[in-house]
Each structure stands twice: as C-alpha cells, then as structure tokens.
C-alpha cells in the first residue's frame, strides 16, 4: 500500500459542488473499503447484488455495437494502439479506450482499468506486463470503460491490487449517487466493485515504491473525477481533456454531469500547473497524448461535441471500435507518436 506524504485542503467552492451528489464519504484516506456482495458478507449492510444486476459486460457489448455505429466517421475518438509512449509509460488499447501502466524500478502502477475486455491479458503480454504483478490501480473515474477489468463480473485479473479512487467518486460505487449521461437525462446502472479501495482527496500526495503520485480533483465529467500527476512528469487525464486536431477541449459534453463545472475544473487545472511551472506529458483516455502545454489547453473554455466536426482529428480512424490495426508486432515497434499539431 502507498504511503501518504502530504495533501492540501479542498476549496470551499469545491466542497459545495458535491452537496447534491450524495452524502459525504464516511471514510478518510487510507481506509480500505469493499462494496457489493463482499461488503454485505462483512455485515456492513450494503445491498447484495445479483450477478444479473451488474452492468460491466452488458455495457461493454452495448458500446462495442451501438457506439461504434454512432461515432463512425465523426473523427472524434483516436485511441493509442497498444505499445510504449516512452521508457516508463505503456498502454493497452481496448477499442476506443486506453489503459496505462507506469513502470519505474521494480514497481508498476496501472492507471484506469478499461472495459471488461476479453483480450486484456493477451495485450498486456505484448508489453511484457504480468497482471499478477499489479498491486496499485489508480482510477480516474468509475465509468465502465475505466473500471471494467475490476468490476464484479470481470475475470479477476487484478484480485491482488488495491483500487485508488476519489472519495467523492466512490459515492457512485456505494450507490449514494447515480451516474447520469446524455445531458443528465439517463441514469446508468450502478457499477459494482468488490476489491479493496483507498479513498483519495484533492491534493493528496502518495509515495508508492519511490514513485510520487499527486491527485487533482477535476469534477465535471463525473462528480469525483481525479487526474494523476506522476513524478511531476506525466499527467493522466482520464476523461477531463479531449485532444482534437487544433488542441485540447473539455471532454464530450453529452457525457458530463455538469459541463460548466467541467470547464471551471479544466481552467483550474491549467492554472495549478502553470503556477508550478510544470509541463508534463498530457496522457488522455481516448485521444492520445501531447507534450505541448499550450496545445493541451488551447480550447479549455470550450466543450467537445460529438456532433460537431469542428472538434475532430482527421487522423482519427473511421471506426475507432475497429482495432484490427492493433497488433503485437506494432506494440513492439518503437514508441507511440504524440498527437500532431494542426495550426
């Protein structure tokens, strides 16, 4: 387990944001929690969920079919193929989403857990990463394309890993809040996770095997979305930042809990990095990476709309759910290119 070595108090405005997202989290950082059937078995009173109630496999199949049809030709999604960004960061492609791994010394951290995806272990093998060695998984947010591999109906590749997740985001997992999409018109089924959890706060800093992980709360896409700054060099942004051909935007508008809040959060993130003169690699969940600070925040005051071609990248595949070009030979052939800048 990681060792906490610092942190900052949340601003009052940020605290107020969560008033409507469910009751306050009861457990402080470093308190491990379980949910679903495991919690019920432990006598916590949490509801016992039947296997048929769990959404991961159903949601994965829905996205593969329906969303593939919806987003074809939109030039929105541009995931990285499986491979290495540099000597420390690797990724696995799962259709439109990426899972990331950060390796330094003898420690490997995993950032997000993707879909409930049948080929994950195979593709990790392309990178020389054994699922059994993963002990720490940092979750940016609880959507099923970011937690699928650790949901209750997953194959259980990471049973030995602890999940690090924002204490506010955990409200979705406990059922205290419901995740809403399509401009908050539709409530998604509850995600069920039975693994140990470490609840994180804004500004928390962890030391895990000599690796420094700093947590930034960036609510908007979800109420408790976190981004993770690792060793002051790599910023894993989840679904906060969308890289188009002409720069970064706030993430897809139709999928946010609160778009105005998402814009404010992105602006606040830029300011934090600028004040500290940090220029990390910006590594996104669906649209690749860039090391260009100005490019990353070029349109931080604008939302990405999947129905407007002005937020697009002509280099994006026609159908990002078609991963036929994601191959083992490609994963072992050099480093993955960053997003090309189109001025």
Residue ranges and their predicted role:
Residues 56-60, 64-67:
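Eukaryotic low-complexity, intrinsically disordered regulatory regions enriched
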Residues 57, 315-343:
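C-terminal regulatory/interaction regions
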Residues 68-73, 78-80, 167-219, 223-295, 306:
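Metallo-beta-lactamase
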Residues 109-112, 137-138, 215-217:
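Short catalytic-loop micro-motif centered on adjacent basic/acidic residues
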Residues 1-49:
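Compositionally biased, low-complexity flexible segments
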Residues 74-127, 227-238, 242-244:
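Conserved beta-strand hairpin/beta-sheet module of binuclear metal-dependent hydrolase folds
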């Amino acid at each position: 387990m990681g060792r906490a070595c610092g942190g900052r108090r949340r601003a009052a405005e940020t605290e107020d944001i969560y008033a409507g997202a469910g009751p306050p989290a009861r457990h402080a950082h470093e308190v491990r929690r379980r949910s679903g059937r495991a919690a019920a078995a432990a006598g916590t009173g949490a509801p016992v969920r039947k296997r048929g109630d769990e959404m991961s496999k159903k949601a994965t199949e829905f996205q593969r079919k329906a969303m593939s049809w919806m987003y074809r030709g939109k030039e929105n999604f541009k995931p990285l193929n499986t491979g290495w960004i540099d000597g420390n960061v690797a990724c696995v492609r799962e259709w439109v989403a990426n899972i990331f791994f950060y390796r330094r010394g003898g420690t490997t951290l995993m950032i997000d857990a993707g879909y409930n995806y049948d080929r994950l272990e195979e593709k990790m093998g392309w990178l020389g990463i054994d699922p059994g060695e993963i002990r720490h998984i940092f979750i940016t947010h609880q959507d099923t394309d970011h937690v699928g591999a650790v949901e209750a109906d997953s194959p259980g590749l990471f049973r030995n890993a602890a999940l690090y997740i924002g204490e506010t985001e955990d409200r979705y997992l406990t059922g205290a809040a419901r995740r809403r999409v399509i401009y908050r018109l539709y409530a998604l089924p509850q995600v069920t996770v039975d693994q140990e959890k470490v609840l994180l706060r804004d500004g928390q800093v962890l030391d895990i095997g000599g690796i420094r992980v700093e947590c930034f709360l960036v609510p908007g896409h979800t109420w408790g979305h976190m981004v993770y700054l690792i060793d002051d060099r790599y910023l894993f942004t989840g679904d906060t930042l969308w890289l188009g051909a002409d720069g970064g935007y706030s993430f897809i508008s139709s999928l946010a809990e609160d778009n105005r809040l998402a814009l404010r959060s992105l602006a606040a993130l830029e300011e934090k990095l600028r004040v500290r003169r940090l220029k990390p690699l910006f590594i996104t969940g669906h649209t690749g990476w860039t090391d260009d600070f100005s490019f990353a925040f070029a349109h931080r005051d604008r939302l990405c709309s999947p129905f407007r071609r002005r937020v697009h990248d002509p280099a994006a595949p026609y159908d990002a759910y078609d991963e036929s070009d994601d191959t083992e030979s490609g994963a072992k052939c050099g480093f993955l290119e960053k997003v090309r800048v189109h001025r």
